[in-house]
Amino acid sequence: MKNELATAVKQVLEDYPNGYSNLMGEPGDSSFESKVKLSEAEGVQFVQHSLSGRSVISWQARLVTTEDHAEAKKKFRAAYQQLQGLQVRIGSRAYKLRSPYEVPNLDQKFTSLVFELEPSNSYSESIKIELQMLFQMPMEWAVGALIYDRDRKDTDPGRVLRSF
């Protein structure tokens, strides 16, 4: 996964002004194949959903699913290191991804890091990049990354990774 996630996130963010039209492949029910691939990911897709009465697209990558908390935690940390400080260009503006790190705890069933685009402005405020580690039944930990629009101004985690 050496910088592969960073490259993918950069590609997706840079196509944000185009509504991801250059990166969406064949449509499914409510999802689209992603032309942006991650060799070790278990699934990468664009998902269409409704937000405040409008149709929006989000990008989701399931990086790993494992029964081993330590392995999931290691993958989560490696993904964070790829994204923290990542420089991207959206339209004519340059941004850096920033988020404080939180160590996933075995007793916590969900850890979420929401990256902000800096410098923040009215255009970039709603774009969120999120890294998640969550516990799923029967006994698995999943690590994934998401890019989505958010109208709310709060610190609650966004969408939970859906099953691919």
Predicted regions and their residues:
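Generic hydrophobic, helix-prone segments enriched in Leu/Val/Ile
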Residues: 1, 5-10, 71-76, 83, ...
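Long, charged/polar, surface-exposed segments that mediate recognition or autoinhibition
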Residues: 43-107
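A charged, solvent-exposed segment within the mature domains of Sec-exported extracytoplasmic proteins
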Residues: 86-164
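N-terminal leader/targeting segments
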Residues: 1-56, 163-164
